[in-house]
From Swiss-Prot:
Task performed by this protein: Late protein responsible for processing most or all of the viral core and membrane proteins known to undergo morphogenesis-associated proteolysis. These proteolytic events are involved in the transformation of immature virions (IV) into mature virions (MV).
Keywords, in A-Z order: Hydrolase, Late protein, Protease, Thiol protease, Virion
SUPFAM superfamilies hit by this protein: Cysteine proteinases
Active-site residues (renumbered): H242, D249, C329
Origin: domain of life: Viruses
Annotated protein name in UniProt: Core protease I7 homolog
Organism name: Fowlpox virus (strain NVSL)
Length: 421
C-alpha cells in the first residue's frame, strides 16, 4: 500500500504519473520493459520481428512471406509472378490462401515450419475485469487519510466493490497460447501451468511429503527433463487458488519467484541463500526468527525441491504488492513470464530490473494490457489495427506522458539555464 499513499491523498493521476516514472526507469536502464507498440495490430510484433526480416514484415498478414512460400513449394499455393514486388506477391498469396480455406481456424491447421498461429495475438476468451485508477479510489493510505476528508484527502473518490470477478480469471489455455509463441526461438522455455491446490487442506508439516508424492510433481520433473537444451525453465503454479510463477536459470542454478500479491519476509523460513526484493531496500535475507506461514508453503517447498533435484544455489521473490483487486493474478503472472521471455533474468541484476517493472504496474494498467496483448475481437488472417477500449485508454495515458515530459523539459531547462547563466 505504501506506493499508492501519496498518489491517492494528493489525487495525482496514477496511470499517467506512474507510467512516466516507468519510462524514466526504462530509459536509464533500471527496469525491464515490454514494447506495447508491437501489439498495435492483431499480430504479435515480437514474434514477427524475430522471424520475418523481409520488407513485408507486419504487412498484409502477420504471417511472413517465407512461410507462405513454403506453401508454394508444396503446391498448396500458386507460384508467384517474379515481375511483381514482394508486397504484391505477399498480397496475392494471402488472398489465394484465404479463398482456398474456410476461415482463420482452417488456415491455422496447415502445418508449417513455424506454426502460423504464433504470429497472431491469441484470442481472449476471458472478461477484462473492472479496475480504476487508484488515485480516485477511497484508499486509506495513512493516518491522515483515515481521519477523513477534511484532514486533507480530496473527496473526488470513486466507490468500487473489491470482489473477485470469476469471468475475468485467466485460463491455463489463454496463458499457454500467449506464452508459447513469446518463448519460441529464445533461450526461455515455458512448460505450462501446475495445480498445487492438492496441498491446500494439509497441515504445513505434511505439505512437503504430500507434494513429493503427487503426480503433478512427476509432470513437472518430466517437462524439465524434456527441455534440457533451454537455459531458462518457466512455469506458473496455483496454490490456495492464487496464481504465482517461477523461472529457473540452469546455468546459474538460480530460481526466481513472482507473486503479484506481495510477500512478508517474516512469514517465510530463513535460508542463507533465499532473498526478498523490496523496491526501497533491495535484495535481503529475512530474520533467523522468521517462521513459515501457510500461504507461503508452496514457495518454500518449490525452493527445496529445486535445491534437492537440480542443485539450485540461490532464490528470490518480490516483497511489494502489485495487485490490489482479486481477479487478475493470472494476468500478472502471464505478463511477468512474458517480460522474462524478452529479458531473461541472468542473475540478481536481471531479476531486479524485472521486479522493478512491476513497481509501476497496477490493476488498471494490467486490464488495459490484457485487452491489448490479446485479441478481443474476431480472429482475422489479414492485418487489423487495434482500436478497442484498452488501446484507447493506453494512448490517452501515453499522450498525458508526452505532454508532461514537454512541460517538465521546458521548466527544468529554464531553471538550469538560470543557474548556468
Amino acid at each position: 500500500m505504501d506506493k499508492y499513499t501519496e498518489l491517492v491523498i494528493n489525487k495525482i493521476p496514477e496511470l499517467g504519473f506512474v507510467n512516466l516514472l516507468s519510462h524514466i526507469y526504462q530509459t536509464v536502464g533500471l527496469c525491464s520493459s515490454i514494447d506495447i507498440s508491437k501489439f498495435k495490430t492483431n499480430c504479435n510484433g515480437y514474434v514477427v520481428e524475430r522471424f520475418d526480416k523481409s520488407e513485408t514484415a507486419g504487412k498484409v498478414s502477420c504471417v511472413p512471406i517465407s512461410i507462405l512460400m513454403e506453401l508454394v513449394e508444396r503446391g498448396m499455393l500458386s507460384k508467384p509472378d517474379n515481375s511483381k514486388s514482394q508486397l504484391e506477391v505477399k498480397t496475392d498469396l494471402v488472398n489465394e490462401l484465404i479463398s482456398k480455406n474456410n476461415g482463420f481456424e482452417d488456415i491455422m491447421t496447415i502445418p508449417t515450419s513455424i506454426p502460423m498461429k504464433y504470429f497472431f495475438k491469441p484470442v481472449l476468451k476471458e472478461k477484462v475485469s473492472k479496475a480504476i485508477d487508484f488515485s480516485v479510489m477511497d484508499i486509506k493510505g495513512d493516518d491522515v487519510s483515515r481521519m477523513g476528508i477534511r484532514y486533507g484527502e480530496n473527496d473526488k473518490v470513486v466507490k468500487i466493490k473489491i470482489a473477485p470477478e470469476r469471468d475475468a480469471w485467466m485460463t491455463n489455455t489463454s496463458i499457454h497460447q500467449f506464452l508459447i509463441p513469446m518463448c519460441y526461438g529464445t533461450e526461455v522455455i515455458y512448460i505450462g501451468q501446475f495445480n498445487f491446490n492438492f496441498m491446500n487442506r494439509h497441515a504445513i508439516y505434511e505439505k512437503s511429503s504430500v507434494f513429493n508424492k503427487n503426480t503433478e510433481v512427476f509432470k513437472l520433473k518430466d517437462r524439465i527433463r524434456d527441455n534440457r537444451s533451454s537455459r531458462f525453465i518457466m512455469f506458473g503454479f496455483c496454490y490456495l487458488h492464487h496464481w504465482k510463477c517461477a523461472i529457473y536459470d540452469k546455468n546459474r542454478d538460480f530460481i526466481c519467484f513472482y507473486d503479484s500479491g506481495g510477500n512478508n519476509p517474516n512469514e517465510f523460513n530463513h535460508y542463507r541463500n533465499f532473498f526478498f526484493y523490496s523496491n526501497s531496500d533491495g535484495l535481503n535475507r529475512n530474520s533467523y526468527l522468521s517462521s513459515l506461514a501457510n500461504e507461503n508453503a508452496d514457495i518454500d517447498i518449490l525452493f527445496n525441491f529445486f535445491i534437492d533435484n537440480y542443485g539450485v544455489t540461490a532464490g528470490c521473490i518480490n516483497v511489494e504488492v502489485n495487485q490490489l483487486l482479486e481477479s487478475e493474478c493470472g494476468m500478472f503472472t502471464c505478463l511477468f513470464m512474458a517480460v522474462c521471455c524478452l529479458n531473461p533474468p541472468k542473475g540478481f541484476k536481471g531479476i531486479r530490473k524485472i521486479y522493478t517493472y512491476f513497481k509501476f504496474l497496477a490493476d488498471k494498467k494490467v486490464t488495459m494490457l490484457k485487452s491489448i496483448l490479446f485479441n478481443v475481437g474476431k480472429m482475422e488472417f489479414t492485418i487489423k489495427e487495434v482500436d478497442g477500449e484498452g488501446m484507447q485508454q493506453y494512448k490517452k495515458m501515453e499522450k498525458w506522458c508526452a505532454n508532461t515530459i514537454n512541460i517538465l523539459a521546458n521548466k527544468i531547462t529554464s531553471r538550469v539555464e538560470d543557474i548556468i547563466n
